[in-house]
């Protein structure tokens, strides 16, 4: 997925869409732009925090995969759109420090977003009980990384969590 907020350029979105890349949107404007550019349904990921109800409504209307930022968003989303989609994702924040080798990349523990490890287990239990069938995990643990070492380290952490959640 391409983070639309990085470069909300219709021409770039068009090229990336043609190569099969979806859009990661963090606002109503980005959702509308991606949808207008022909990116549809599950090819749009909606990841936002402090989300107004009308943005959840629009994301659901266009079939975007909604990535919940907080455990309280489960009830808020259900009340807002009247149901929970069959596919939902949750943003994970493991807390502590995120490091590669001896370098501290960032401090997710200080971040304002994401489910804690305990909330991931509770959230997925709630979602499953409410009929959600497909689950995604999203995380963003460091900004402005300058090497590719970040990605396999993050992937390992997410896959280890997925195995535990199963």
Give the location of each predicted region.
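Active-site-proximal beta-alpha core segment in soluble small-molecule metabolic enzymes
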Residues: 1-166
């Amino acid at each position: 997925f391409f983070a639309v907020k990085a470069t909300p350029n219709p021409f770039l979105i068009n090229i990336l869409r043609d190569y099969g890349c979806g859009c990661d949107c963090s606002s109503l404007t980005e959702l509308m732009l991606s949808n207008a550019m022909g990116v549809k349904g599950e090819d749009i990921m909606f990841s936002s925090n402090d989300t107004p109800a009308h943005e959840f409504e629009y994301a659901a209307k266009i079939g975007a995969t909604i990535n919940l930022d907080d455990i309280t968003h489960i009830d808020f989303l259900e009340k807002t759109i009247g149901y929970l989609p069959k596919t939902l994702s949750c943003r994970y924040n493991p807390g502590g420090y995120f490091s590669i080798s001896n370098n501290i990349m960032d401090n997710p523990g200080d971040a304002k977003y994401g489910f804690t490890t305990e909330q991931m287990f509770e959230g997925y239990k709630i979602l499953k009980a409410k009929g959600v069938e497909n689950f995604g995990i999203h995380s963003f643990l460091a900004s402005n990384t300058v090497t590719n070492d970040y990605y396999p380290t993050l992937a390992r952490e997410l896959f280890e969590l997925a195995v535990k959640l199963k």
